[in-house]
Design a protein with these regions (language model features):
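Acidic/histidine-enriched alpha-helical segments
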Residues: 1, 144-154
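Acidic, S/T/G-rich, low-cysteine, solvent-exposed domains in lumenal/extracellular/periplasmic regions
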Residues: 1-143
Length: 154
């Protein structure tokens, strides 16, 4: 995934700074103006062929100028006619409502570097904040709605 808009990447066009969309999974995070950094992320393709009980929402999105390289071994990040044009989802939440009014919730982010401490520091803890809010959303119930993380020594 390569970002063509310099306002949506940091240092290199494959260090993506996506748009954060306000959804149930990350509402507070989105309203606080944090940034997210997703190096070497992959685009997520949503399908329309899902059960009626399933809802897929975009959490993180590239700009319209992003593109997916078809030939990743070409040695070039320049856009070619063969490349797939964006925008792309880089994070989604998936909810399925069951018959007994219970829900199954999944959050998927497409960068394996999202939780890397150096990457997180580059956005002043934004990645960690988003992950924690996502976990809190998935774990919330009538009994509890908070997640506790032990303090770290710096």
């Amino acid at each position: 995934m390569v970002e063509g808009d310099s306002q949506h990447y940091a240092q290199m066009p494959y260090y993506l700074v996506p748009t954060v969309n306000s959804t149930d999974a990350i509402t507070d995070f989105a309203s606080k103006g944090y940034y997210v950094l997703m190096p070497t992320a992959q685009g997520i393709q949503k399908t329309d062929d899902v059960r009626d009980t399933v809802t897929i929402e975009s959490l993180l999105t590239t700009s319209d100028s992003a593109y997916s390289k078809i030939d990743v071994n070409s040695g070039s990040i320049e856009k070619t006619d063969d490349d797939i044009e964006g925008p792309f989802d880089l994070g989604v939440s998936i909810t399925e409502t069951l018959d007994d009014d219970k829900e199954t919730q999944i959050v998927y982010y497409s960068s394996s570097s999202l939780m890397d401490s150096q990457i997180n520091q580059m956005v002043s803890g934004g990645n960690e904040q988003m992950i924690m809010e996502s976990l809190s959303w998935m774990c919330s119930s009538d009994e509890t709605s908070t997640i506790s993380v032990p303090a770290k020594d710096l």
